[in-house]
Amino acid sequence: MALNLRKNHPLLKIVNDSLIDLPTPSNISTWWNFGSLLGICLVTQIVTGLLLAMHYTADTSLAFTSVAHTCRNVQFGWLIRNLHANGASFFFICIYLHIGRGLYYGSYLNKETWNVGVILLLTLMATAFVGYVLPWGQMSFWGATVITNLFSAIPYIGQTLVEWAWGGFSVDNPTLTRFFALHFLLPFVIAGLTLVHLTFLHETGSNNPLGIPSDCDKIPFHPYYSIKDILGFALMLASLVALALFSPNLLGDPENFTPANPLATPPHIKPEWYFLFAYAILRSIPNKLGGVLALAASILVLFLMPLLHTSKQRSMTFRPLSQILFWVLVTNVLILTWIGSQPVEQPFIIIGQLASLSYFTIILVLFPIAGVLENKMLKL
C-alpha cells in the first residue's frame, strides 16, 4: 500500500497536523475564529506592505512626497495604501476580540500560549507605531516625538536612551530611516512568534466555551473548521475592502495630510484609535514617570491573568458575577478609548482618571474576589 504523502512527508506532515487532521473541540464558537483572522491580517499586511515599500523613500525630504506619488501615479497604489492603513485597524480589532475571548473563557490558563500572545500584542503595537511615522505627516512626526520622549522619564539613562533612539537631538532623518527598517523587520518577527504561539497551543489543544476538557469529543479541523474559517475570511476581507474603497480616511487623522513641520504643533496630538485607551491611561496620571509606568502596566497586566485566576471553573460561562465584571471592563476600555481622543480639560480629565482606576481595580482586585465568592456560593 502506498504511503499517504500528506501524513509522512516531513513538511506536509507539519501542515497536516496543524490544519487538516488537528483534533479540535466540537463546540468551539465563532469567538475561536479570530486566531485565523489574525493570520490573514498578517499575510495581507506583509503583502501590501512589501508593495508599498517598493515605492517608498525613507528620507525626511521625500517620504511624504513618495507616499503621495504612490497614491497618484502607481497602478492601484491608492488601493494598496488604503488596504494597508485600514488593515492595521482590522488587525487590532481582531487581536482585541481575540484577547477578550481569552479573558472570558479562561484561555490564559494555557500559560505559555498566553504569554507568547501578550508578547505578540506588544510587537504588533511597536510595529503599528513605527509604521504610523513613515508617511511623515504632522501627526506622524509629533506622535513619534511625544511617544519616544516618554523614554526620557526613565531615571538616569532616560535622556541618553531617547537621543540614542532618535539618532540625534530630535526626531529627524536618522529616526525615519531606522523606523522604516524596524517596520520592515517586525512583521517577520510577528510571523515567527505566531509559529511559537501555535506550537504551544497545539501542545495542549484548544480550550472551549465550557472550559472543560474535550478529549472525549474531538473532530478533525478539516473540513469542519476550515470551512468555518473561510466564512470568517470572507466577512473580514469584505469589510476591509468596503472600508478601504468607500471610507478610507474614516479612522485616520486629517492632520496627517499636512507634511511634517517641527515648528508647528498640531492642536491635539493623539495616536490612532487602537492606542487611545492606553494613551488615556498615560494622560490620567499628572506625572511623567507615573504615566509611563501606568501605560506599560495597562498592557503588561495581561501577564498576571493566570496568577489572578481564583475560580475553580475555567470559563466565565457559568459565573454571572465575573461576567458582569468582564462586560464592565469592556465598557471601561471603550470609555478610555473615547477619553483618549478628547482634549485635556474637564470633565474629560476626571472621567479618564476614574476609568483608569477602575480598569486596574477590576483586573487586579475585583476579578480575583469574584472568583473566590463564586467558589463559596457553589460550595466548590
Curated annotation (Swiss-Prot):
Record note on quaternary structure: The cytochrome bc1 complex contains 11 subunits: 3 respiratory subunits (MT-CYB, CYC1 and UQCRFS1), 2 core proteins (UQCRC1 and UQCRC2) and 6 low-molecular weight proteins (UQCRH/QCR6, UQCRB/QCR7, UQCRQ/QCR8, UQCR10/QCR9, UQCR11/QCR10 and a cleavage product of UQCRFS1). This cytochrome bc1 complex then forms a dimer.
Where heme b b566 is bound, by residue?
98, 197
Concerning InterPro entries, the annotation shows:
Cyt_b/b6_C, Cyt_b/b6_C_sf, Cyt_b/b6_N, Cytb/b6-like_sf, Cytochrome_b, Cytochrome_b_C_euk/bac, Cytochrome_b_N_euk/bac, Di-haem_cyt_TM
Organism of provenance: Vireo olivaceus
Keyword Transport in record: yes
- Subcellular location, record wording: Mitochondrion inner membrane
Role noted for this protein: Component of the ubiquinol-cytochrome c reductase complex (complex III or cytochrome b-c1 complex) that is part of the mitochondrial respiratory chain. The b-c1 complex mediates electron transfer from ubiquinol to cytochrome c. Contributes to the generation of a proton gradient across the mitochondrial membrane that is then used for ATP synthesis.
Which cysteines form disulfides?
Answer: none
The keyword NAD is annotated on this UniProt entry: no
Q: Record's PANTHER family?
A: CYTOCHROME B
Q: Mind listing the GO molecular function terms for this protein?
A: metal ion binding; ubiquinol-cytochrome-c reductase activity
**Per UniProt, where does a ubiquinone bind?**
202
Q: What is this protein called?
A: Cytochrome b
Entry keywords, A to Z: Electron transport, Heme, Iron, Membrane, Metal-binding, Mitochondrion, Mitochondrion inner membrane, Respiratory chain, Transmembrane, Transmembrane helix, Transport, Ubiquinone
The note on the cofactor says: Binds 2 heme b groups non-covalently.
GO cellular component: a single term: respiratory chain complex III
**Where along this sequence does the record place binding of heme b b562?**
84, 183
Q: What processes does the entry annotate via GO biological process terms?
A: mitochondrial electron transport, ubiquinol to cytochrome c
User: Could you list the residue ranges forming a coiled coil in this record?
Assistant: none
Miscellaneous notes: Heme 1 (or BL or b562) is low-potential and absorbs at about 562 nm, and heme 2 (or BH or b566) is high-potential and absorbs at about 566 nm.
Domain of life according to the entry: Eukaryota
Principal location class: mitochondrion
Q: Which residues cross the membrane?
A: 34-54, 78-99, 114-134, 179-199, 227-247, 289-309, 321-341, 348-368
Cofactor annotation:
heme b
Q: Which SUPFAM superfamilies match?
A: a domain/subunit of cytochrome bc1 complex (Ubiquinol-cytochrome c reductase), Transmembrane di-heme cytochromes
